[in-house]
Amino acid sequence: MIIASTFDYRKAAKRRLPPFLFHYIDGGAYAEETLRRNCSDLQALALRQRILRQVGGVDLSIKLFEQRLDLPIVLAPVGLTGMYARRGEVQAAHAATAKGIPFTLSSVSVCPIAEVQEAVGGGFWFQLYVLKDRGFMRDALERAWASGVRTLVFTVDMPIPGARYRDAHSGMSGPYAGLRRFLQAFTHPHWAWNVGIMGRPHDLGNVSTYLEKKIALDDYVGWLGANFDPSIGWHDLQWIRDFWKGKMILKGILDPEDAREAVQFGADGIVVSNHGGRQLDGVLSTARALPAIAEAVKNDLVILADSGVRSGLDVVRMIAQGADAVMIGRAFVYALAAAGEKGVAHLLDLFANEMRVAMTLTGAQTLKEITCESLVNTDAFKQ
């Protein structure tokens, strides 16, 4: 199979993965309207092509906090990444490190913090949810800091899990889910051997380390549902801000008022995100939400954006809308599932090449030269 884009990697991942895993990463909440609009709204932004702009030697690098990145891309936290390739978090972290960008380890990863640290050293980021079990949160933060993590991505848009119809149909949840997953694995022998058998253990590494017992896939949804805390407010986060000595990014901002409150709270950055359309269906796409948020807090903190990014062209569009950099989740998981570490590295090369073409043809030699003027009709999404 010829692989030339994220879309090709998606097709390859669909062939290789059992349906319950493919649809878990591919799907969204409810009827998936926001999932679709994340992509369609972003791709609807027309790039403004210019000619004879004397663009040579396009520079894709950026400095985020104290870290120099070769690309304005961060691999987003994705739960259960280790189910998509053998020890998948380690493979993705290797690829990101080799390409000079951060990998963000999910708190509900298969590989624990220590395993990733042993593989790539420090420099990766760590993501944490708001949970009722404050002991787990404190333990995870301490382990992350001891492993060299200096950037915390704190997810704030998941006080309660979103309803995902696809999961019930695919076998991730719903009636006879365990039996359905077993039968699917049986009909996907490559995954069953390479990941299902050779990729063990398949527990939630960070949670199991803390509880000193395995939290397996069957317990994943139940454990999360029992530990999400919908009652939390800004004041409840203060202990985390005081406890964490590194940079802190709040992930899941969709409203300018929340962005302003993040500044007042003392966040170093935000991720404009609707959780990839996986939480509340019917909310704004990131492409539509980003301009107003950037206008409100652009000079106060670092702005990242995710949800709907499938190419280097989309990266340029997000930056033109006001982001400093982007996070990608589904895209890298497709590549990881299809071709492991090499697939993720290749995907990042594709993104970089697409960015170079887009920047050259829009007259931008550096990322700072990508502005709203790089788009046509940018007022269309302003609120």
UniProtKB/Swiss-Prot annotation:
* An annotated Gene Ontology molecular function: FMN binding
Q: Which gene encodes it?
A: lldD
What is the top EC class of this enzyme, as a single word? Answer: oxidoreductase
Q: Which residues form the FMN hydroxy acid dehydrogenase domain?
A: 1-380
Q: Describe its membrane topology.
A: Peripheral membrane protein
Cystine connections: none
Sorted alphabetically, which PROSITE patterns does this protein's record hold?
Answer: FMN_HYDROXY_ACID_DH_1, FMN_HYDROXY_ACID_DH_2
Query: Keywords of this protein's UniProt record, alphabetized?
Result: Cell inner membrane, Cell membrane, Flavoprotein, FMN, Membrane, Oxidoreductase
GO biological processes? aerobic respiration; lactate metabolic process
Q: What is this protein called?
A: L-lactate dehydrogenase
Q: Give the main localization category.
A: membrane
Subcellular location, record wording:
Cell inner membrane
Kindly state which reaction or reactions the protein catalyses.
(S)-lactate + A = pyruvate + AH2
